[in-house]
Design a protein with these regions (language model features):
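Flexible, Gly/Pro-enriched loop and linker segments at secondary-structure and domain junctions
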Residues: 1-31, 51, 136-178
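Aromatic-residue-lined binding/catalytic grooves and analogous aromatic/hydrophobic interfacial grooves
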Residues: 3-6, 32, 42-46, 61
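Helical lid/core segments from catalytic subdomains that handle acyl or acyl-like groups
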Residues: 91-149
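Acyl/amide activation-and-transfer machinery of modular secondary-metabolite enzymes
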Residues: 22-41, 82-107, 180-186
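Short, basic, low-complexity termini and linkers enriched in Ser/Thr/Gly/Pro
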Residues: 212-219
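Hydrophobic "lid/gating" helix adjacent to the active-site nucleophile
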Residues: 48-85
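Active-site-proximal acidic secondary-structure segment that organizes catalysis
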Residues: 160-211
Length: 219
């Protein structure tokens, strides 16, 4: 994953960066219900598991927002060209392990799903919560498929932790028959504001409806 250092000297958010950076808990997050009807239907038609499909869509939505690709590195900020993901895999004994997925937007859906399933199986066999590589360029992803929740609080190792975290819960039908699912995004407020969080959800909704970030239907 390639990245470059940002020059914050003349950034309009320089003051905001310094202000939130020194707070004991500088993280901000929102939970929003999103319509996953189309993705659930496609997964059923293709015989795909929903979890890795949703991971891909969430990563695509996040990568379309530059602020979510930024990380605090010491006294500097770096921006990745694109970020990959580390997600939780549930194990048979009720514990969990971590699984890293690489995300290539040019990869076809069938190829991605085959790759993701192979990586998930490998991770479960290893059953480790030790990350394979440097985690700086990753999104941290988890799922709580047993609950349709209203709020989710991500654990953070400290105020310098700047990897965005994404979670979702159980999808269920609303009064219109749409399958709605809570999705939570948490990020470092020194790097990300409400506008950027809103952009993530706009991208996510468009992708879930089969559109790209510009709103045009995908082939």
């Amino acid at each position: 994953m390639l990245c470059h250092e940002l020059d914050l000297s003349d950034s309009p958010r320089r003051a905001h960066f310094e202000h939130f950076r020194h707070m004991p808990d500088p993280h901000v997050g929102l939970t929003v219900d999103v319509d996953v009807t189309a993705l659930v239907q496609r997964c059923k038609q293709e015989g795909w598991p929903f979890y890795p499909a949703m991971i891909r869509v969430a990563v695509m939505a996040a990568n379309a927002v530059p602020e979510l690709r930024r990380r605090i590195r010491g006294e500097t900020v770096v921006e990745y060209d694109a970020c990959d993901s580390s997600h939780i895999e549930l194990l048979d004994d009720g514990s969990y392990c971590y699984c890293t997925l690489r995300h290539d937007p040019a990869q076809s859906w069938p190829d991605y799903m085959a790759y993701a399933e192979a990586q998930r199986a490998k991770a479960r066999a290893g059953a480790s919560i030790e990350e394979e590589d440097d985690v700086e360029g990753l999104y941290f992803i988890t799922s709580v498929p047993w609950l349709h929740y209203r709020e989710f609080i991500h654990p953070n190792p400290g105020p310098e932790a700047s990897n965005p975290s994404i979670a979702w819960g159980k999808y269920q039908a609303d009064w219109r028959g749409r399958l709605m699912m809570p999705v939570t995004l948490s990020a470092h407020h020194s790097l990300v504001d409400g506008l950027h969080i809103a952009s993530f959800y706009q991208n996510l909704n468009q992708l879930l409806q089969g559109k790209n970030e510009k709103g045009r239907s995908k082939n």
